[in-house]
A protein has these predicted regions:
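Hydrophobic alpha-helical bundle cores within soluble ligand-binding/oligomerization subdomains
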Residues: 2-6, 10-413
Length: 413
């Protein structure tokens, strides 16, 4: 006689109505801590740690952030962008020999392949936001190079693709901008460093050393900054095993959102609207009365001053000019107005406020503010892509269903 196997009924999860408490949990009765038991995170994943990283950290309560243990602000003051790029990829700062070898490695990677260059005019003509043509061009570039899924590559091959994406980004951004203006692209100069090359390719004239240095400090200060939206997007895509180009394209898409990458030009627009110090109260109180955000103030991580803003304020002072003086007046008065209205929050300038001033003083057009940010942040994206691929587990969270109860009978007609 055949013995029947006893089947234990599946325990159904208990789903309570969506609570007002964002940290409320979804539990499975009788299976405490069982694999797959959901943990409900707050909206936006604020404060949620999803992985370990050795790339850097943001300590908001201290007003401090670093790249691989070195203060990012100190790096911006003392090291060129290429050294910081090397640091994020290799894990240590280069010595003189490593610096020369790295420069020799990345210099030829700045040139746009002929098959990609041939299509850039059409991409530029297609229009869209400043990052839209770049997103398309990066996708084309990755296909042109034959980038394969990260899961199929060894570490050296992944590094090769990541280097290529970082090196080509400033060239593509400036070429697309110039083509959109009806101008010919300017090839990178092998004798110029990254920041100088960026301004050279943007304008077609040799940049003033002071401008190149100011832009370099900005670029170094924005290479990486924790698990922001675009970096997290890049890691999610990398976790699927997709190619590095696909991960960067996704990150660009995230950066194109105004809540992430669109504030530098908007902060500068505020300065233009104010015009003179005597109009600060009138303009700002109007925006506050309308319930609008004052662009360039406040940060989701920093509870006081953004260290990047502090550094860029000094860079702006070094550049000088009436606009810088106005910015300092606006910074001081807006902080007072915000303190009066929101005494429980210490809203101070974030990186975007003085970033716009610095870039404008260095001749970077406003439509290129966010692309300029992308030209350095791509290094952080790629460092995170490499780190994700080195110890990968696909990022696959869950969602809580809050629609009508299921299953429902399918109606017939």
């Amino acid at each position: 006689m055949k013995t029947q196997r006893r089947v234990t009924p599946r325990t159904k999860p208990t789903i309570s109505p969506l609570p007002s408490d964002p940290l409320a949990t979804l539990t499975t009765p009788g299976i405490p801590g069982a694999p797959g038991t959901p943990l409900v995170a707050p909206r936006g994943l604020k404060g949620v740690i999803v992985t370990d990283t050795a790339i850097g950290d943001v300590r908001g309560s201290e007003g401090f952030y670093h790249y691989r243990q070195y203060s990012a602000v100190e790096l911006a003051e003392k090291r060129p962008l290429e050294d910081v790029w090397f640091l994020l990829f290799e894990g240590h700062l280069p010595d003189e020999a490593e610096r020369r070898a790295f420069a020799a490695e990345i210099t030829p990677l700045r040139m746009v392949p002929d098959d990609v260059a041939a299509v850039l005019p059409a991409i530029a003509r297609a229009g869209g936001g400043p990052l839209d043509p770049f997103r398309t061009a990066i996708s084309l570039f990755a296909a042109s190079r034959g980038m394969r899924p990260l899961i199929d590559l060894n570490p050296a091959e992944r590094r090769r693709d990541a280097l290529a994406l970082c090196a080509i980004t400033p060239t593509l951004l400036t070429a697309l901008h110039r083509l959109g203006l009806g101008l010919e692209p300017v090839d990178p100069d092998p004798d110029l460093a990254a920041a100088s090359n960026y301004l050279w390719m943007l304008h077609g004239i040799r940049p003033y050393p002071a401008h190149a240095r100011a832009i370099e400090q900005y670029l170094v200060s924005t290479v990486d900054h924790g698990f922001n939206a675009s970096t997290f997007t890049a890691r999610v895509i990398a976790s699927t095993g997709a190619d590095a180009g696909a991960a960067v394209v996704g990150a660009i898409g995230a950066l194109s959102g105004p809540l992430h990458g669109g504030a530098p030009s908007r902060a500068l627009d505020l300065l233009d609207e104010i015009g003179t110090p005597d109009r600060i109260d009138e303009v700002v109180t109007h925006h506050l009365a309308e319930g609008e955000v004052i662009m360039g103030f406040g940060h989701p991580v920093y509870q006081g001053e953004d260290p990047r803003s502090v550094m860029l304020r000094d860079v702006a002072r070094r550049l000088g000019g009436e606009q810088v003086a106005l910015a300092e007046h606006v910074e001081a008065r807006v902080a007072q107005l915000l303190d009066e209205r929101k005494p429980d929050r210490r809203l101070r300038t974030n990186v975007e406020f003085y970033a716009g001033v610095v870039m404008d003083r260095c001749g970077v057009p406003r439509e290129m503010f966010t692309p300029t940010f992308a030209s350095s942040r791509v290094i952080g994206w790629c460092a995170n892509i490499l780190e994700q691929a080195a110890a990968n587990k696909i990022i696959r969270p869950s969602a809580r269903y809050v629609g009508p109860p299921a299953p429902a009978p399918v109606p017939t007609i």
